């Protein structure tokens, strides 16, 4: 059970004082296993049944009515070396709602985190989304984002970092009317005292 927030009811352009509370029952089962120090896996299945989920459609907060969401999530982790961690996840969602925003049918993630030395850390990830509903006037979105981060601990108090996000310059939308940024590069210094 969740009452609409003050923001959902009264603030900004999406406000809707007629919103009803959300009700939901969620069932989840999960099993995980570490096969060795090198490999671990888990599987989670879920079933969710509810009424009046609050979402934003056509720039207004609305209740969805009755819904059933069910899906499965798979996860693998590996430590082939003490300095390297690999991870992979996949998620599938089936929903009874044709227009459920912000909930892609398929998602995956592949990640690598390498501690190249005591001072240098390099991580990369690939995040993919398929079948994301945005609006009836926008095609369902499917995209992949490749990201890279390099961090160097220059001294006890300072870490220099660089991030490259959306390296492949994928074009996608997650909210109607708001294109997401293409390739982005940023860097900085993080100070710890």
Residue ranges and their predicted role:
Residues 7, 20, 125, 163, ...:
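Residue-level detector of conserved, well-ordered beta-strand and adjacent loop positions
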Residues 1-79, 100-105, 136-140, 180:
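Outer-membrane beta-barrel signature, preferentially recognizing the C-terminal barrel domain
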Residues 45-50, 62-135, 159, 168:
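Gram-negative outer-membrane beta-barrel transporters
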Residues 51, 86, 128-133, 148-193:
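C-terminal beta-signal and adjacent terminal beta-strands/loops
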Residues 29-33, 74-78, 88, 110-114, ...:
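Residues on the lipid-exposed face of transmembrane beta-strands in outer-membrane beta-barrel proteins
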Residues 26, 40, 119-121, 145, ...:
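Active-site lining segments that contact anionic ligands and/or coordinate catalytic metals
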Residues 3, 36-38, 79-83, 117-119, ...:
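Strand-connecting loop/turn motifs
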Residues 139-147, 151:
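Short amphipathic alpha-helix initiation/capping segments at coil-to-helix junctions
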């Amino acid at each position: 059970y969740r009452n609409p927030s003050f923001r959902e009811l009264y603030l900004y352009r999406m406000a809707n004082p007629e919103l009803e509370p959300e009700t939901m029952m969620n069932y989840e089962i999960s099993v995980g296993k570490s096969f060795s120090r090198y490999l671990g896996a888990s599987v989670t299945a879920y079933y969710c049944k509810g009424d009046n989920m609050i979402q934003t459609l056509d720039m207004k907060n609305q209740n969805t009515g009755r819904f059933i969401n069910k899906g499965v999530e798979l996860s693998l982790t590996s430590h082939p070396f003490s300095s390297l961690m690999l991870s992979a996840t996949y998620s599938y969602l089936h929903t009874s709602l044709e227009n459920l925003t912000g909930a892609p049918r398929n998602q995956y993630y592949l990640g690598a985190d390498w501690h190249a030395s005591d001072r240098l850390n390099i991580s990369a990830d690939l995040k993919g989304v398929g079948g994301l509903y945005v609006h009836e006037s926008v095609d369902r979105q499917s995209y992949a984002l490749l990201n890279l981060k390099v961090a160097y601990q220059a001294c006890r108090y300072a870490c220099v970092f660089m991030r490259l996000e959306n390296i492949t310059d994928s074009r996608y939308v997650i909210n109607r009317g708001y294109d997401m940024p293409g390739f982005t590069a940023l860097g900085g210094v993080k100070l710890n005292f």
